[in-house]
């Protein structure tokens, strides 16, 4: 792992009783310094973030610009908005091995994860700062989940703001 990698990690329980956030009125733009720092974090292991392989926070911002900000389970919506406003990719670690990949959407598309920091379970890689595996995504039946904010020490103040916001919200769960 990069010495600059500074994750926020939460293990949470969700009973579905709390409302999720509203989509932001205006679509926040991710500042260039944030994009640069997050992409540098991904490049550490040799991954090349671009196109479909860009950080999840950038994909989310683009979806928002295009009016494609779907409403999904409130807990996922909450972290999508935190990602959108902070610019940090957020997933629910090791570097991906050569040839390792996982399906990230219902149509079966794969993300090659060689060189990326990945979350794994007994079945293999399950998430990364680019996309999460389809088989491990949170849905309406999810009660317990794991969240990672893929932060970097270069943006410590911004990460502290995210931590305070998430701590405040999760203290009510």
Question: Where are the regions that the model predicts?
Answer:
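Charge-biased, low-complexity intrinsically disordered regions
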Residues: 1-173
